[in-house]
Amino acid sequence: MEKPSREAFEGNNKLLIGIVLSVITFWLFAQSLVNVVPILEDSFNTDIGTVNIAVSITALFSGMFVVGAGGLADKYGRIKLTNIGIILNILGSLLIIISNIPLLLIIGRLIQGLSAACIMPATLSIIKSYYIGKDRQRALSYWSIGSWGGSGVCSFFGGAVATLLGWRWIFILSIIISLIALFLIKGTPETKSKSISLNKFDIKGLVLLVIMLLSLNILITKGSELGVSSLLFITLLAITIGSFSLFIVLEKRATNPLIDFKLFKNKAYTGATASNFLLNGVAGTLIVANTFVQRGLGYSSLQAGSLSITYLVMVLIMIRVGEKLLQTLGCKKPMLIGTGVLIVGECLISLTFLPEILYVICCIIGYLFFGLGLGIYATPSTDTAIANAPLEKVGVAAGIYKMASALGGAFGVALSGAVYAIVSNMTNIYTGAMIALWLNAGMGILSFVIILLLVPKQNDTQL
């Protein structure tokens, strides 16, 4: 049978299912480790700092490379890069499950981050190329369900699989899903950008960004173990500050920068992107709360994950509600309402000093508010970021916005896990969890202030 040409091909359900399955390899499977930290500590015979690196490094590498991967997809083909991303996920999953060596766990998670960086921009571009009008809106809705829904259910899913089958089955299932995705996407005509930019990719900027973020991640996760006066700590701190300073200088001079800082001259875009970074940072709530109820209350990973089911339900319901609020109230009010509700949820989840039954009730209600808030915030924030970017820079602006999402999640998990470990060692796990969760509430409050100050009442100010 002759393969259909790009011009003749129309997106169908087979391709869409393949796209959604490829998306959940990151948002559902890779992210589900937030609920199996104690199990991984025992399985790999390692400390919580090493496990925190393994958990956070996937989102970290996804965030670092997502903009560059989007450019590669445009140049060499979106189908090709999606397939490469799926194959990388299979490779990363295999490295994670074949041994009990912590180094292979970290390398496997790193490769999964590269996989997500390839899959996310490439699949969005495929949808834009092959789905039109209402079909495109439908496809984007399913893509969002795969990402937001996957992140909502990942805690429960990880706990359920780890308890019933063993944690390695998370990645065995991920490999199976990846193979199905490859089969469903096979036969789709390649799609590339018609106008390839002649500008060279900003390799120097990418290298400096990788050095800076890796150094910072190690400082956060291993800082207390290294000691602030140790030579390695001071060296890593100097590398972080030096690479960050050099990155800023070079990016401002570059003709085709990795991060175009001119975009941040627009207050609305800055407010949406900065608040997005911080609210993705509250993903640290999941790793702290799940670890606490397992270590402190003796719950299984399945029981711990069950507490967050209200989060999953509410975030899926409220995404469409947030869209309607955006249409009637503009962008600022829904973003403020969503963030405010999320802060209330964070505060409820942080009440670790309560008796067990009362704390469980607070957790269930807290996760409900958590999902409700994120669901209301999501669409208005994305719309604000995209609407306030000039037409010729929409792709770059969207890439930076997604980079903020991934890096926010990575550092939120790393920082929350580090604070939990440090304070728990100094006091007890109840206080450690409470302080770490207060940190997440603080990020929510800072996000609220940024939205209040930077996002205009009417989203009509363009660059």
Curated annotation (Swiss-Prot):
Task: Name the domain of life this protein comes from.
Answer: Bacteria
What membrane topology was assigned to this protein in its record?
A: Multi-pass membrane protein
Keywords, alphabetical: Antibiotic resistance, Cell membrane, Membrane, Transmembrane, Transmembrane helix, Transport
Segments crossing the lipid bilayer? 17-37, 53-73, 86-106, 107-127, 142-162, 165-185, 201-221, 230-250, 273-293, 299-319, 334-354, 357-377, 403-423, 435-455
One annotated Gene Ontology cellular component of this protein: plasma membrane
The record's annotation in Pfam families points to: MFS_1
Q: What family, per the record?
A: Belongs to the major facilitator superfamily. TCR/Tet family.
Name-wise, this protein is Quinolone resistance protein NorB
